[in-house]
Amino acid sequence: MSEEPRFDTVAKAAATPDLPQPYTELGMKDEEYARVREILGRRPTSAELAIYSVMWSEHCSYKSSKVHLRQFGEKAPDTDVLLVGIGENAGVVDVGDGYAVTFKIESHNHPSYVEPHQGAATGVGGIVRDILSMGARPVAVMDSLRFGPADAPDTQRVLPGVVSGISSYGNCLGLPNIGGEVGFDAGYASNPLVNALCVGVLKHENIKLAQASGPGNHVVLFGAATGPDGIGGASVLASASFDEESQAKRPSVQVGDPFLEKLLIECCMELYAKDLVVGIQDLGAAGVSCATTELAAGGTGGMRIELDRVPLRDPRLTPEEILMSESQERMMAIVEPDKLDEFLAVCAKWDILASVIGEVTDVTPEEEARGGRLVMTWRGETIVDLPPRTAADQGPVYHRPIERPADQDALLADDPAALPRPSSDEELRDQVLRVLAAPGICDSSWITDQYDRYVMGNTVLAMPHDSGMIRIAEDTDRGVALATDGNGRYTRLDPYVGTQLAYAEAYRNVAATGARPLAVTNCLNFGSPEDPGVMWQFAEATRGLADACQALGTPVTGGNVSFYNQTGSTAINPTPVIGVLGVIDDVHKRVTSAFSAEGESVVFLLGETRLELGGSAWADVIHGHLGGRPPQIDLDAEAALGRVLIDGAAAELLVSAHDLSDGGLAVALAESCLRGGVGCEVDLGDDAFTALFSESAARAVVSVRPEHETALVDLCAKHGVPVRRLGTVGGSALTMVHRTGRISIEVAELRDAYESTLPALFGNK
């Protein structure tokens, strides 16, 4: 009589239906566990429980957000640029000349607080593999960062680690970091936001999908060996709130190896070029559990896996640990039998470990409608036998309670228009410098200089300009521009309008460089979905983004939801970060945000300025105030301004263009002066304060040569965009004339205020 295995098997599960299981420790609710039992017709094995616990986690299943995210598809604009939409590892859009671009943004917030360097580094590695798994060569990365107060001890710990993690991983991969943003607010203390974006380029015919099709095809796991790092990351770190014990969660943070990922990229590109891959999936959150269930669910058959064949760094790992491990730099491919030897040879060439761990299986006629089975064995015994779609696609969907926060009306009524304003030109001058020097507005070179922005030689624009821009290939002048934006202050005041303002700012930033906005990705950072107030914010934010994208014809291609961004019961300000991608036909016609010191230039303000200070940088920096209504949103005005900027760039009318956002005209003028190393003199009109600090949307500052003034004014009239001549570029100072006075700040003084803040806080790099 053979000895009964010491591990949990399907046979043992059927024979011991009442055996207690630690499902609550794995983050599952009573009703979720009951549903698993109903699906299987028995209790799950411990390996099956591991799979369902991570695949049904908030991070992987979107169980609280799915009902709201559906409107991105339901309200999708009618466009022919979308080649692959929501549901795959990343969206893919047509950019012309037979080329496509894939891009996506994702969060690695919680791991980056627990272990800043590795958390941020593996965030970059994970999003790069998402892009790689679509069949594309990754060509650039970006990041959107939020931290607590810049002078707080915890920020002093977290920020340098996050920046070093992003820079070391991206630089080792040889990928330029072309842009992003950084913000500071007390609400992000102990809960930083680290959102990483990657963009890749491919030909239409080379798109790859996560699907396991073709019975008899091999399942190959390749890349790093599997270790204990990151076990339970999807459920432990990404699907629960922080508390005072968060540092104890350090073992759940993954460890990255960028040099191995670089080899993995080159290996995949050769595999794609030789047509050796049927389907492919990267291993990120939930590791082998996610890769096997999603590949099987996306295909036409089932899958049989021999878990013993998974290469291990630690031979002591249990089957459950192997399934939940989030070791980095791993991919899973479906390979036809007659191509297997060549596939393995390519992996060997790049020194990439590869192992055949299973095969695609056929389905019976009865199974065809609902898909095949995912069967896994360990030491010859079956430990998993489940319908993969139930784990990957059919997790719980919650209609969470929604309730407008009780303090929302009081917050809106607290109008910053009542705050004390500067009473003299000297005080106004001082406030311009204070806003310019604020940590979330000032020069971010302390951060961006640690990134290689120009490696690979195709970077056209990078920080500090309005968007990053990359030429897509050596044989074309076509390029893509990318910008990410988000403003938690606006979204706290009005999540619907605030999210549209974030989208509109990213849209303007892309248009300001001369690129046509095409598509959108998003990273939605919110507090606990179990809080009805947070769910109200989330519902309003998603509705706002869906409506805005529909209005301006830019489909949402995918993204990420990050819930539980809170410490105890204190949630962050809702922070949807919106990424907009645009295309420019000729990168030589790009427009920068810098005034030109060569020749004469005339400065114009495009768009309408109103007294709008709710959520503004002025109210925050000068008074520490958050209240009132955010700037109003007019999507028709945003579209019209975009057409002026894009057409003006194509006609080579514009010397510079810079959108107005945080800090209003004061910051925009100062930045254009600083980036060009030249001053300007402008007329602010009757109300200098409103002219300088209002944050009305749908505005930009542009400069043109004198001979193009009439053409610009005519172009604005054609599209119905208000236009006002402000002054001229020249001299060594930013000089602002108004009805009762004159303010002048030397460019050198602007530079000192703008560039000294972060080095003073964080030291020399």
From Swiss-Prot:
It comes from the Bacteria. Keywords: ATP-binding, Cytoplasm, Ligase, Magnesium, Metal-binding, Nucleotide-binding, Purine biosynthesis. Mg(2+) 1 binds at residues 106, 560. One of its GO terms (cellular component) is cytoplasm. Mg(2+) 2 binds at residues 130, 282. It is found in: Cytoplasm. Its EC number is 6.3.5.3. This is Phosphoribosylformylglycinamidine synthase subunit PurL. It comes from Thermobifida fusca (strain YX).
